[in-house]
Design a protein with these regions (language model features):
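Short flexible loop/turn segments that cap and initiate beta-strands
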Residues: 52-80, 122
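Structural beta-strand segments of beta-rich domains
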Residues: 43-47
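Short beta-strand elements
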Residues: 132-146
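Short glycine/proline/serine/threonine-rich loop/turn segments at secondary-structure transition edges
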Residues: 110-123
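Enriched for extracellular/lumenal, surface-exposed ectodomains of secreted and cell-surface proteins
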Residues: 123-134
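Solvent-exposed serine/threonine-rich low-complexity stretches and specific carbohydrate-binding patches
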Residues: 73-104, 141
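Bacterial N-terminal signal peptides
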Residues: 8-17
Length: 146
C-alpha cells in the first residue's frame, strides 16, 4: 500500500515542480526577424526586433548587438537605424556609443557584414534589456556570403 502512495506523491510533486517552472518564465516576449541566414557581405541586412509583455502590451527596451564566434563575443556594436547606410560611422559601427532605446519595435535597415566575415559561422546576438523585467539574448545563426 505504501508504494502506490509514494508513487502518486512523487508524480504530484513532479507536476507541481513543472507548473512552478512554467510560471517562472521570462516576463516578456522578444523576437528577432531577419531576411536570411546567409546575408551578402557589404550589403544591407535589415532586421526587426519586437518586445512586448505576455499580454501583448508594448514595452520600452534598449538593444545592443553582439557578434559571437565559437561561443565567445568578438565584437559589440550599438544600433543606429537612423544613420545613413553609406556613412563612415555606420560602416565602422561607431555612430552610437550606447544602447539604443525603443518601444515595441526596432527596425534596423543598416546592419552590414564585412567581407572578411564571409564563410565563417557566426551568431548575431541582440541583447534586449527591459527595466525591471530583465535581459534576453536573441541569437540568430549567420554565414555571410560574398
Amino acid at each position: 500500500m505504501r508504494r502506490p502512495f509514494a508513487a502518486a506523491l512523487l508524480t504530484a510533486l513532479a507536476l507541481l515542480a513543472l507548473a512552478g517552472h512554467a510560471t517562472a518564465a521570462t516576463p516578456f516576449v522578444a523576437t528577432l526577424k531577419a531576411t536570411t541566414h546567409n546575408p551578402k557581405a557589404d550589403a544591407a541586412w535589415p532586421i526587426t526586433v519586437t518586445v512586448r509583455s505576455h499580454s501583448g502590451k508594448s514595452l520600452r527596451a534598449t538593444a545592443i548587438y553582439q557578434f559571437v564566434y565559437n561561443g565567445q563575443v568578438v565584437a559589440t556594436r550599438y544600433p543606429s537605424p537612423k544613420a545613413d547606410l553609406h556613412s563612415k560611422c555606420n560602416k565602422e559601427g561607431t555612430c552610437r556609443h550606447s544602447a539604443y532605446p525603443f518601444t515595441w519595435r526596432l527596425r534596423d535597415p543598416t546592419v552590414t557584414w564585412p567581407a572578411r566575415s564571409a564563410g565563417i559561422a557566426l551568431k548575431f546576438r541582440v541583447v534586449i534589456k527591459v527595466k525591471g523585467l530583465g535581459t534576453r539574448n536573441l541569437d540568430y545563426s549567420v554565414r555571410v556570403r560574398r
